[in-house]
From Swiss-Prot:
Any one GO molecular function term: 5S rRNA binding
Compositionally biased tracts (Acidic residues): 196-207
Native source organism of the sequence: Methylobacillus flagellatus (strain ATCC 51484 / DSM 6875 / VKM B-1610 / KT)
Protein's name in the database: Large ribosomal subunit protein bL25
Regions that span the bilayer: none
Function, in words: This is one of the proteins that binds to the 5S RNA in the ribosome where it forms part of the central protuberance.
Alphabetical UniProt keywords: Ribonucleoprotein, Ribosomal protein, RNA-binding, rRNA-binding
Annotated InterPro entries: Rbsml_bL25/Gln-tRNA_synth_N, Ribosomal_bL25/Gln-tRNA_synth, Ribosomal_bL25_b-dom, Ribosomal_bL25_C, Ribosomal_bL25_long, Ribosomal_bL25_short, Ribosomal_L25_dom, Ribosomal_uL5_bac-type
GO CC terms of this entry: cytosolic large ribosomal subunit
Family label: Belongs to the bacterial ribosomal protein bL25 family. CTC subfamily.
Amino acid sequence: MAITIKATKREGKGTSASRRLRRAGNVPGVVYGGDKEAVSLEFNHKELFLEFRHETFHASILNLEVDGQKEQVVLRDYQLHPVRNTIQHIDFQRVSASEKVHVKVPLHFINADIAPGVKLAGGIVTHILTEADVSCLPKDLPEFIEVDLSNLEAGHSIHLSQIKLPNGVEFVQLAHDNDAAVASISKPRGGAGAEGEADAEGEAAAE
């Protein structure tokens, strides 16, 4: 079920007006895109933050309700206070059912515990990317993408081109010939062979 966020049109603009909004517990924002003009908005911070803190809010089609009228949007940008971690400003972009959107989608890594590089070699998994930019129609937008590490060996990486995507979804980076590494498994320091040699040397010294 799509998340619905409520807003009202914002009359005052500029730094002073935005400060007054924040002091009153609200967040200045804007919605733009499509064949409509940009509209300045204000949101109740408490209500907005309850949804904002969830991962799905950042990578899904949202219902934006402004003065009773709903339209579909995606989160495009936001600013957080460096100390209080409150939302200072937020931007949304309108979407059309017939036009592709570019959205950063979270990567969920699975089966790391059974990867040969971990289970057999004792390697350590490193997540190089935690999200990736995808292109698709709004109806095909996934909330997250699974990255299966079950066959990954120590000393190797898994790249975008090796990840299975839902139908209709593609990685933007691959369209620009950038097959970025997503995760890797580093070999244990010294390696199993080195440990064996060390044990043998210790036994010889004891004799």
